[in-house]
A protein has these predicted regions:
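Conserved phosphate-binding/catalytic loop of the ribokinase/pfkB sugar-kinase fold
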Residues: 76-82, 89-124
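A structural signal for isolated positions on well-ordered beta-strands in alpha/beta enzyme cores
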Residues: 49-52, 75-76, 129-131, 160, ...
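Short acidic, glycine-rich surface-loop motifs adjacent to enzyme active sites
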Residues: 127-139
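Conserved post-catalytic alpha-helical subdomain immediately downstream of the catalytic base
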Residues: 212, 237-296
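Conserved phosphate/ATP/ADP-binding segment of small-molecule kinases
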Residues: 137-231
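Substrate-binding N-lobe of the ribokinase-like
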Residues: 15, 19-86, 296
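Gly-rich Lys/Arg/Thr-decorated short loops/hinges at beta-loop-alpha junctions or inter-strand turns
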Residues: 13-22, 93-106, 179-186
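Positively charged, low-complexity intrinsically disordered leader regions
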Residues: 1-12, 297-310
Length: 310
């Protein structure tokens, strides 16, 4: 996925229709979705292998160009004859005026499906954890997800998934999923606003879908981590928010690193909250840097910097 930002100004209303005239001044293009998770992991020094599918179009070419910037990583990219996904945001004085999306949500073909399975089986033995970023754009069918989860469990490799599919049967038997508040509420048909409600929703998801851990991202209310042993809630600090796009990707990256390194749950959530707070304070999709994450001399800094392969 490609995240595009067009910065400009509006000084007048169009004579053609009652709409503002946007004068473009600057453009920026960065990886979004799974690409943003990948960038966050690489930024923190994690050796990461990316397996993905893009379209044979200009957006796909730009995605490949951005991926080439990360040389200390592996990339397996299948190019399919379909439209790549992009989100173009037009901003005036830091405020989003409109977002224009381009996408094709049709399921990938048999060749792309086989490509993913082939390289997944090849790479999983070289890595300590699997991270799936499911934006529901046609790559992760229930069949493919079930296959990837089954392979991960057979290899005893933890698999962490950021879900967008409303059918959570697709994520059965996964190690950890990270739904947001809305997704959690929709799948359980319950309110999940308070800590107690979030805990109850997490337990329902775990029991119904045989998922070992649930991390609910609750925006300004923080994070709730639920497993069979305990439930931990981590609140956020009040900060000025400029742009929430990509914050969930950053949380996914941090939690994956901490999980792979057996970091204490409470500290893992504090790190994830801190990282998310850092990126929402910037305009546009951005990544967390080591110096931002560890500037307060967190006690596990040495252990976390000795990060594993994802």
């Amino acid at each position: 996925m490609l995240d595009r930002y067009v910065f400009g100004k509006v000084n007048r209303v169009s004579p053609e229709a009652p709409v503002p005239v946007f004068l473009s001044e600057k453009k920026k293009e960065v990886l979004g979705g799974a690409g943003n998770v990948f960038n966050n992991l690489v930024s923190l020094g994690v050796f990461t292998t990316l397996i993905t599918v893009i379209g044979s179009d200009a957006i796909g070419d730009e995605i490949k160009k951005n991926l080439k910037k990360n040389k200390k990583s592996n990339k397996h990219i299948f190019i399919e004859k379909k439209k790549s996904t992009s989100k173009t945001r037009y901003l005036v004085n830091g405020q989003q005026l409109i977002r224009v999306d381009e996408e094709n949500k049709n399921e990938i073909g048999k060749q792309a499906y086989s490509f993913i399975l082939k390289f997944f089986k090849k790479e999983i033995t070289k890595h300590d954890i699997v991270v799936l970023s499911d934006y529901n754009k046609g790559i992760f069918s229930t069949k493919l997800l079930n296959s990837l989860i089954k392979i991960s469990n057979q290899k005893k490799t933890p698999i962490i998934i950021d879900p967008k599919n409303k059918n959570f049967d697709a994520y059965k038997n996964s190690t950890l999923i990270t739904p947001n508040l809305l997704e959690t509420s929709q799948v359980t048909n319950l309110n999940c606003d308070t800590d107690k409600e979030a805990e109850n929703c997490g337990k329902i998801i775990m029991k119904k879908y045989k998922i070992k851990n649930v991390l609910i991202t609750r925006g300004e209310k923080g994070l709730s981590y639920i497993n069979h042993k305990n439930s931990i809630h981590s609140s956020t600090k009040k900060i000025e928010v400029f742009d929430v796009s990509g914050a969930g990707d950053t949380v996914l990256a941090i939690i994956s690193i901490c999980f792979a390194n057996n970091i204490d749950l409470k500290e893992s959530l504090n790190l994830a909250n801190k990282a998310a707070g850092s990126v929402v304070g910037k305009i546009g999709t951005s990544v967390i840097k080591k110096n931002e994450l560890f500037k307060d001399n967190i006690k596990n800094i040495n252990k976390i910097i000795n990060i594993k392969n994802l």
